[in-house]
């Protein structure tokens, strides 16, 4: 459910982006609605509304949600202020690389890896598995950032499609692969499960 709520602003961005630009009358002012700049404005507004509602209802936002919201406000505002979509194209790469940096930093700062802080309350795994899992997330975020950057500046007609559905597809595939990997190791840290020799 949380992932769906986080996806709402991006989905609205995609819908508005795909609209044919049309002129609408708003309080006597003619505005063009549709295309990248209208979509960016919708992304900013919907992000503030969605994360604002979450903050009001839960009295907090997760760090990842704060990062996503701030990045949306910064890169979205720059896109509108300078009327250049280049700024927005950098949003996904920068956010992904900052996530990767956070996972990398947890190898050197703190007493637990970031992935263990996130999932440790629900899973019991050997330390080597936690380490491999944390590294896998680092690689995933680095790859997603690079893929978004490559598509944004190489295939400009498709970068919004990739931003929404390509990134979602990569995330789903990674989570499925992670689930398969974890299913092989969940018993390793369970003392009630007898170990078998290969």
UniProtKB/Swiss-Prot annotation:
Annotated localization: Cell inner membrane
Q: Which GO terms describe its cellular component?
A: plasma membrane
Note the InterPro entries from the entry: YciB
> Can you tell me where the transmembrane regions are?
36-56, 67-87, 90-110, 135-155, 162-182
Q: What does this protein do?
A: Plays a role in cell envelope biogenesis, maintenance of cell envelope integrity and membrane homeostasis.
Q: Which PANTHER family match?
A: INNER MEMBRANE-SPANNING PROTEIN YCIB, INTRACELLULAR SEPTATION PROTEIN A-RELATED
Identification of the protein by name:
Inner membrane-spanning protein YciB
* Species name: Pseudomonas fluorescens (strain SBW25)
